[in-house]
Amino acid sequence: MDLWLSIWLYASLAIAVVNLALLVRHWKEWDALKRLAPLAVTALVLHVWEEWRIPGGFWYLYNGGVPNYPMSQLTDMVTNFSGIVLGTIVVLYGANSITSIVMLAISGMEVMVHGVILRGKSEALYGVSYNPGMLTALCCFLPLAILFLVFLIRKRPKLRQILLGVVFAVIVNFACVALPEAFLADPASPYEFTDPGFYSNLAE
């Protein structure tokens, strides 16, 4: 597991490159929603890199400085890598209105979490609005959410598709975020974070 935790971010970058290559290859034949799907996967990869490495330190804000609970390297890897893999499966098998609603919901959630909730927490605790993940949330996920919404409105999905999209969005969020922490969160977890990243100079 230690080996995988040391390389999974780079594996994610490789997956992002594959997604972009598929986008270029199929640009002319794909409709707007299918084109947005690989961009959403790529945005997630960039988002994870911002949270973990550039500048990193998302865990420090999320955990209140605790290096391994409730979020550890293991739980957050499972959360993010599963999302990247699921998104890539959607790209490979063809995005549609239902999967696009899921991606719209996730994009909107990232904007809300980093742009509002964690921004407030970071301001309250450290006196800064920025939190790791905020830049990609606002510069990548926010435009994607708007584009998904615009093209979904143009596509006019049926009520059944909208409801299924909402249900699947809840399921994906539960499976990728809630379950890993429910089953893998451990105050004694050896998979701890060590670098406060952005908060290195702000931490007491």
Predicted regions and their residues:
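Hydrophobic transmembrane alpha-helical segments in integral membrane proteins
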Residues: 1-15
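Juxtamembrane "helix-exit" motif on the non-cytosolic side of transmembrane helices
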Residues: 24-26, 93-94, 115-126, 151-154, ...
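Membrane-interface helix-boundary motifs at transmembrane edges
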Residues: 23-36, 92-99, 151-164
